[in-house]
From Swiss-Prot:
PANTHER family the record matches: ACTIN (PTHR11937)
Assembly notes: Polymerization of globular actin (G-actin) leads to a structural filament (F-actin) in the form of a two-stranded helix. Each actin can bind to 4 others.
A GO CC term attached to the entry: plasma membrane
Protein source organism: Xenopus tropicalis (Western clawed frog)
One MF term in the entry's GO annotations: hydrolase activity
Modified residues (N-acetylmethionine): M1
Gene3D superfamilies: 3.30.420.40, Actin, Chain A, domain 4 (3.90.640.10)
Enzyme class: hydrolase
Protein name: Actin, cytoplasmic 1
Miscellaneous comment: In vertebrates 3 main groups of actin isoforms, alpha, beta and gamma have been identified. The alpha actins are found in muscle tissues and are a major constituent of the contractile apparatus. The beta and gamma actins coexist in most cell types as components of the cytoskeleton and as mediators of internal cell motility.
Domain of life, per lineage: Eukaryota
InterPro entries in the cross-refs: Actin, Actin/actin-like_CS, Actin_CS, ATPase_NBD
Keywords tagged on the record: Acetylation, ATP-binding, Cytoplasm, Cytoskeleton, Hydrolase, Methylation, Nucleotide-binding, Nucleus, Oxidation
Gene giving rise to this polypeptide: actb
Function: Actin is a highly conserved protein that polymerizes to produce filaments that form cross-linked networks in the cytoplasm of cells. Actin exists in both monomeric (G-actin) and polymeric (F-actin) forms, both forms playing key functions, such as cell motility and contraction. In addition to their role in the cytoplasmic cytoskeleton, G- and F-actin also localize in the nucleus, and regulate gene transcription and motility and repair of damaged DNA.
Amino acid sequence: MDDDIAALVVDNGSGMCKAGFAGDDAPRAVFPSIVGRPRHQGVMVGMGQKDSYVGDEAQSKRGILTLKYPIEHGIVTNWDDMEKIWHHTFYNELRVAPEEHPVLLTEAPLNPKANREKMTQIMFETFNTPAMYVAIQAVLSLYASGRTTGIVMDSGDGVTHTVPIYEGYALPHAILRLDLAGRDLTDYLMKILTERGYSFTTTAEREIVRDIKEKLCYVALDFEQEMATAASSSSLEKSYELPDGQVITIGNERFRCPEALFQPSFLGMESCGIHETTYNSIMKCDVDIRKDLYANTVLSGGTTMYPGIADRMQKEITALAPSTMKIKIIAPPERKYSVWIGGSILASLSTFQQMWISKQEYDESGPSIVHRKCF
């Protein structure tokens, strides 16, 4: 497909929005899912101040803004802001007219029905798209890894899901959701850095801590052993320069932060860790397909980017599973964007073209058409 009629693929994550054209191998635009509003009206006289900023511009002016994320735990909570993000995506990032392109959107598994209806309504009524489709994020990640059967552990900024998929269809009864993801880990890192004497409190400072997390954190293979190493030597210490030039040193926080994925009690949560959640998800599936799921456990999303996470998952799931079971954790290098890549693949398949919801179908049936056509 050439660019002029190419479908648009928009993966709206809680933390980052990934957007581009179907058939491309990577998103053209990746920007934070943030809408910022000035804290004080009219401070910047003559700056042509806008009443709201989106994405990177909001990020760069964060000192004078209050930042809000319209997507929480993978689900849209503020539709006005969400519309701003979509508007920004089409007109500023991709520079396309949405009324000329089919749009593929993504959604969290177990997304409330009203949410997908609202997405559908906004696409057809506000942006006048000729056609659209809503696909489940984890299923797209599996397609991107070249499989149609497997279990996806998808962990982003706002939510973590384990989604077993058989022959291309998600098994809804076995999907498990964990409200513990990147943003919680950033908040936890803010907290444990405060214990070290560094204070990070504002929404702007949270973004600095997110950067520290992304650059320096890793998952320990054996947490207790790593704690002992950190206590007895400075070999694990790293330094980080803050925007104001101050240099901070971070030690065991580097692996204590993502350890919360395996031990949510660190965050005061009673849920199971990602390893147990994955295992529980597999156990909710038919006994005959479990073997295929254990052997095709695919990691996806930005929160699976920590060095060491795949080895640790392998170790933990091996300990839970039957001893003879073959376990394979697949961690594709591009997994940060695998939902988007899967969407790009799906939207450019010739067999997919009859799956789009057309404007005509929407006009006849209304928003509820989405439940009949997207599953």
